[in-house]
Amino acid sequence: MTLKHINATEAKKLVDAGALLIDVREAHEHAGENIPGARNEPLSRIAGADLGAASAVVFHCKSGARTRMNAQALSGCTDADVYILDGGIDAWKAAGFPVKRG
């Protein structure tokens, strides 16, 4: 298992190749704005989440702070390679990648 911090371009490549994208923000944050295809699994309940058999999982939050602070706990949720999107959805938007607004 890998635990690696990546930028938005690397995250986009992984997601395009089939990685599971998990938004760890609370449901109201995800509803207001999200990355298309991202699954919402808030940190408050991530421990019980079924992440399936994905070979790679990319976690993100708004700015990267929550995922960075919880990286070890997040990596314990799956046997897959774990990636943390540095800068979160803010970095994704700054890279020009699409977001969906509620």
Where are these regions (language model features)?
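Rhodanese-like catalytic fold shared by cysteine-dependent sulfurtransferases
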Residues: 1-20, 24-58, 65-102
